[in-house]
Structures are given as C-alpha cells and as structure tokens.
Amino acid sequence: MTKLLAYFPSPPQGVWHLGPVPIRAYALFIIAGIVAALLIGDRRWEARGGERGVIYDIALWTVPFGLVGGRLYHLATDWRTYWGPGGAGFGAAVRIWDGGLGIWGAVALGAVGAWIGCRRHGIPLPAFADALAPGIILAQAIGRLGNYFNQELYGRETTLPWGLEIFYRRDPSGYIDPHSLDGVSTGQVALVVQPTFLYELLWNLLIFVALLYADRRLTLGHGRLFALYVAGYCVGRFCVELLRDDTATHIAGIRINSFTSTFVFIGAVVYLMAAPKGREDPESLRGNQYVEEEPAEPEPATVAATTEAATEGVAAPADGAEAAGADATAQRPEESAEPDVEKPESEETEAEAAEEPESEETEAAEEPGEPEAEEPEEPEAEEPEEPETEEPEADSDEEPEEESGEAPEQPVAEEPEPAPQQPETKRRWGARLRDRLSGR
C-alpha cells in the first residue's frame, strides 16, 4: 500500500446537538449562502438604479420556490435512494436538512418564484436575475462546504496528495458507516477520493470574480449576465461530473447531470447572443413603488376652482378701489356747488358789471395755465381758500399778465379734457378778482 505524502481530512462530524435540537452544518452553510446572495444582490440592485430592499421582498418568493425545486430535482434524479428496493421512503424524502438539493431544480423553480415577486413589484425579471447572478454562484460555493461536512458528493478514489480522506462514522445507535450523517468519526479512514466539492467550490469562486469583472467592463443587462453565469457554471459542472463516483442516475452510461449541463449550456449561449445589448433604463427598475411616489396631476375641477378663487381674490381689491373712486366723485359735485351758493350773497354793483369783461379776459388767460391745475390732486390745491390776508393788487395783476403772456404758446384746442374741479377754480379766481377790484 502506497503511503500518502499528504492528505485532506474530512470533518469528524456534520451535526451537533443543542439539547434535543440538532444543528446541522449543511443547513448552516445553505443559510449563509442565501444571506450572502441577498446582501450582494441588494447592493447591486441599488447600484443599477433599483430601490433598496426590493431584493428581500422578492426573496420571500424566490427562496422557498428554489428550495422546493432543488429538492424535487434531487428526488427525480436519485429516486432509487428513496423509492427503490431498500429505499429510505417518503419520510427521508421530505427531510431536506439531511442534504440533497439539485441546483438545476433550484434555479428553475426559483425563477418562477422570482417572476411572481417581480410581477408584483412591477420590475423586469431579467434585470433582477442580472443583479442576483454573482450572489447565486457565491451561495453555491458556500453551500459546497455543507457537502464537505456531510462527506457526500465526492469523486473517485485517488492517490493524489490533495486527496480527501473519508472516515467511518458511528451514529447514536452504534451503527458504523462512512455515509452516516448523524455519526461521529471513528478516526479510521475508509477511502481517499477526489475532493470534487473543493473543485466546484473553487470554480464557483472563479465564476463569481469573472461575473463582476464582465459586468463592470461590458455593462451586461437584459438577463445576459445571468446567462453568462449559467453557461460558466455548466462548463465547470460538466467537468466535475466526470470525476464523481457517488450513486446517481445514468443515461447511456452518462450521469444525468452531465446531460442537463450540456443542454442548459446551449440554451444559455443562445440567450446570451440573442438578448439586447446594454442595460435597462434605471427608471424601469423602480417598479410600482416609484410610480406611487410620483405626484398625481391635479384634476381639472380642482384647477378650475383654484383659478376662480384666485380671480375673485384679485377682483375684490379692484372693486374696492372702484367703490372708493365713486365715493370721491360723488363728493366732488358738492364741493363745486358751494361757490354757486355764495353767489347770491354777494351784491354786484355797476362797477363790478363794468369790470366783468376784464375778469372774463383773465379767465380766458388762465385757461392755458390749467395744466398746472391738472397735476395730481393734493390737499394743497385748495390753499387759495385759506389765506385771509389781502395781497397787493399789483401782485394779482402781475399773475394774469404773466399767464396771459404764455397763452399763445399753448392753444386751448390742444388741451386735454378739464379735470372735474376746473369750473370751481375759474369761479374762485373770478370771485377773488371781483372782490379785490370792488375793494372788499
């Protein structure tokens, strides 16, 4: 017997008991792989423009469907172990924690669950698959450590230095068997085999790095990155299947997983070549949640009501201004009527009658100067009524003369319409001149 220079030992056991509860390494690594895939997928989904946390919502559909699909594929391809002569029976078929998941069934039925989740959130399934692809292959690599602890899915016997030692294990009932999942190693080597779990683990890690690099350099989208993951994994799985020697279903002397890997590889390559280039629009990855957050357009009735309210608010001050203007206009006739009341009280003499032509000339001369009276009305315009002291007649005579001198420059015909107070101003000047000429 050739003495090995080196060897790769198997773990002494694959299950620990916490009281009556068994803690299985296989289940722990499966859970760890799922968590890693979701964490990576969530970060990648957000980087592509999607909403953070959507991956976890869709995982509520994807993970259960994937576990059921993986178990169904395992039962379909290894049915003799459960229903063949001396099979373990239906009870063992449902004990998924004992190991036995087929990756192709997990991917196929998991895709159905992902489609349901994506449809409910309004996001495209190919984009979701691209974001999750690197995490899936990493989860597969972590899950292979569970096969290592279970001493399962190993290869043929070998004399290579890195060969894997398979120990005999004794279960709680005392039965010794290298395939015992609940047993503890006796320290006795049963055989040395190819560590196929390690080969596939390393290959999966290589695909994980390659996917990240290709996604960054080539900006793959529309499901093309997921297709690249499937094609790459099929190549590695096909090669590993050639080294395995465990119990499996064969077709024409070839393991069934080799057939599956071949056909799935062809389908992945065809999709990779036919899918659209580039990536999806980031806005399409936000789904129904983004649509709900968009502000709703105001209804026409609401817009009309708002416009009417604004119009009424503007019209109200204008109406108030018009009312104030009307009140002011109503007061002006009363003021203009005051001189008419004073006229009967002043008795005109014959001398005043003789001087009336002069006052008429003065009034005519004052008309060209009326633009000064048309300036904005101010309280100062009524000052001529306030002074009680009499000014020298010379001053009063000079003012009309100066104004009469300016008369030819501005014809009366070109003057704008007189202000409402114009007649009142003429009467006041006429009354003052008559009073001063009469010696009052």
UniProtKB/Swiss-Prot annotation:
* InterPro entries noted in UniProt: Lgt (IPR001640)
Q: Where is the composition biased (Low complexity)?
A: 299-330
**Feature: compositional bias, Acidic residues:** 347-417
Which positions, given as ranges, span the membrane? 21-41, 53-73, 96-116, 122-142, 189-209, 256-276
Bilayer topology: Multi-pass membrane protein
Q: Which controlled-vocabulary keywords does the entry list?
A: Cell membrane, Membrane, Transferase, Transmembrane, Transmembrane helix
The protein's role, per its UniProt record: Catalyzes the transfer of the diacylglyceryl group from phosphatidylglycerol to the sulfhydryl group of the N-terminal cysteine of a prolipoprotein, the first step in the formation of mature lipoproteins.
Q: What name does the UniProt record give this protein?
A: Phosphatidylglycerol--prolipoprotein diacylglyceryl transferase
Q: Which organism is it from?
A: Mycobacterium avium (strain 104)
Name of encoding gene: lgt
